[in-house]
Amino acid sequence: MATIKHFQTLGQVIDANITEIASQQNIPRQVAYVRVVNHLTENAIEWRKFSGPNIPYHEPLCRVAYLYGTAPPNANLVETVFRRDKEISDYFDMIHNSKGAVSICAFGGGPGTELLGLAKWIEKRNLGYQIVLDFLLLDKVPEWIDSWQAIKRVIESTLMENYGKNRSDWPI
């Protein structure tokens, strides 16, 4: 039974971020959402420039827009690759079985889509034992750590709700 869902998880993260940012900037939530939509539109234009995108990831609402527009499909791609590619799945298992954990470097890691995609893939496998992941995030935008931590908290909350308080009963 897979309980980790990309849109549900990111929806909780985005909703909490919008509430916090609106409070910090002293603006209504609705205004924050409008600004997110504006960032989505502007970011789409930037990505199509031949000179390379100039996206203001240092702005919190821009990062929320990225979470909304890009994180779900990216997390789905991560999960799909690990689910469909037996070679990478077997390699992942070999590393975990030999070392007791899998260390992953998220280079240009962004908002945490690797964490979300792998968590869903691992849970769906229903292996009967816990997989331990150790992430190293390398990104020129240090603020992405906030969304990584938020995604991790929502995943942990979901796992606790569905598997109980004993973390050794969790799949990840």
Language-model regions: role of each:
Residues 99-110:
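Conserved class I S-adenosyl-L-methionine
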Residues 111-128:
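Conserved SAM-binding loop of SAM-dependent methyltransferases across substrates and taxa
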Residues 143-172:
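S-adenosyl-L-methionine
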Residues 51-96:
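Class I SAM-dependent methyltransferase Rossmann-like catalytic core
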Residues 129, 134-139:
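Conserved SAM-binding motif I beta-strand of class I
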Residues 70-82, 110-115, 141-148:
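Phosphate/oxyanion-binding active-site loops and adjacent basic polyanion-contact surfaces
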Residues 85, 89, 122-126, 152-155:
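Active-site catalytic pocket residues across diverse enzymes, especially alpha/beta-hydrolases
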Residues 1-52:
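N-terminal auxiliary segments of SAM/dcSAM-dependent transferases
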